[in-house]
Amino acid sequence: MIAMGAKGAGYARGASKQNYATPACLIEPVKAMLGIKRFAFDFAADRFNAKADDWWTERDDSLVKTPQDWLDAVGTGWGWLNPPFNDITPWARRCRQLQRLGGSVAFLVPASVGANWHRDWVHDKAYVLFLNGRIPFMPDKPTWGYPKDCYLALYTPGRHAGYDVWSWRED
């Protein structure tokens, strides 16, 4: 997970409420659902929390990269993106731009269906899976979850936009 910097994307770990790494207990079911063994690229990571073998860091600044740069990074595989939750608009826009170029990305965000970014860049453009159950972003506190519901927006060519609920946990 990343936090915003002055120039755009900043990638930092820490206690900020906007800055949580995606736990493996979610990543593994996502990969299984997508039918992949690994993500091709993580668009917002650092060496401690990357969900792919390749990623962009704060110095790389994902949001100043072009949509073509994003496509070149992900290739024909799936990208992963867990952006900072404080300013989602530029990230959602870039996911849509990647999709229009033929790329695929799984985008983890709060389920803020009333937000402008959702209306403009997700609603009729991505396949949305509402996550059944809160995500435990802090692994040392198994009962702690992000205080809001989240969803996974799947941007990929050829898949119709829509909504569903996904029970990702093994309960």
PLM regions: where:
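Class I S-adenosyl-L-methionine-dependent methyltransferase catalytic core
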Residues: 1-171
